[in-house]
Amino acid sequence: MQLEDFDYYLPEELIAQHPCDKRDECRLMVVDKKSGEVEHRIFKDVIDYLNPGDCLVLNDTRVLPARLIGNKVGTGGKMEFLLLKRIDKDTWETLVKPGKRAKVGAEFEFGGGVLKAVIKSIGEDGNRVVEFKYEGIFEEILDKLGQMPLPPYITEELENKEEYQTVYSKNNGSAAAPTAGLHFTNELLDKIRAKGIKTVFLTLHVGLGTFRPVKVENIESHHMHSEYYMLSKESADTINETRKNGGRIISVGTTSTRTLETIADEKGNVREQSGWTDIYIYPGYKYKIVDGLITNFHLPKSTLVMLVSALSSRDNILNAYKIAVENRYRFFSFGDAMFIK
């Protein structure tokens, strides 16, 4: 299949620049994965499409305020550091701009010297290995000094950092939010559980690779970035029990989906596991465990449009996207939601 097969027309004004005032009152498009039939609802109505005995799987990763603005020691030149991946306690793989000022041995400071950094090495991809020096707890310093690393298509500042976190976020480590989860409130989750639907959590730390465009014409030649995931024994047991009893596994977000499909064996059973995944899901892939998917509207020609197409069909999904544009749905990270059932 060709990359062009996953393109669609999107007016720029439909790219949401800020979240919905109330998380669970955004719009929800419900798509039947077999027929492609579309219904228009609001997000809190998702409960009407969940059955007692189903299991909702959510990603509890928490976004690090990983964008740091500082100065080069000696010259005072302004620098931007974006933390990509933790190597050990105080060492991170980091994207540094402007790169020409970030040579090995160069020193930088943030917050008037509360946090200091030195470049230890430079990778083939231009990313820097950076060692940080500070007193206290790194995450607390990052909370004070760091900014949210918003996607490039969001140009407005966040009023509140928590707007880019799910209400159940717990494990620090993501460079971007698992955005399908942003629509849930604690009240809605309580109502879902009260209806007899189980909720379980896994962790996948979302990397910046999620925003990297596909650069090959033949989609089968594309290689995914790798991301760290974790599934507990308790969550695995609940998922397996749900399937044994005939319930559906409803994945919240493409990150939960990729984690479940990585861990599941050929019979669709999962077990406690952690590791790195670079699973690439596109049409032709046979889902092993995920029955339904709650997700946002994704970028044209992205691997995420391919992933949702694999659960339904390319024609069904692109038709749903066309209907979404015609009905002025809001797109991307802060946009409206889709439930493929």
From Swiss-Prot:
Pathway: tRNA modification; tRNA-queuosine biosynthesis. Keywords: Cytoplasm, Queuosine biosynthesis, S-adenosyl-L-methionine, Transferase. GO terms for cellular component: cytoplasm. Signal peptide: none annotated. It comes from the Bacteria. SUPFAM superfamilies: QueA-like. Its EC number is 2.4.99.17. One of its GO terms (biological process) is queuosine biosynthetic process. InterPro entries: QueA (IPR003699), QueA_dom1 (IPR042118), QueA_dom2 (IPR042119), QueA_sf (IPR036100). One of its GO terms (molecular function) is S-adenosylmethionine:tRNA ribosyltransferase-isomerase activity. It catalyses: 7-aminomethyl-7-carbaguanosine(34) in tRNA + S-adenosyl-L-methionine = epoxyqueuosine(34) in tRNA + adenine + L-methionine + 2 H(+). It is found in: Cytoplasm. Monomer. Belongs to the QueA family. Transfers and isomerizes the ribose moiety from AdoMet to the 7-aminomethyl group of 7-deazaguanine (preQ1-tRNA) to give epoxyqueuosine (oQ-tRNA). HAMAP family: QueA. This is S-adenosylmethionine:tRNA ribosyltransferase-isomerase. It comes from Clostridium acetobutylicum (strain ATCC 824 / DSM 792 / JCM 1419 / IAM 19013 / LMG 5710 / NBRC 13948 / NRRL B-527 / VKM B-1787 / 2291 / W).
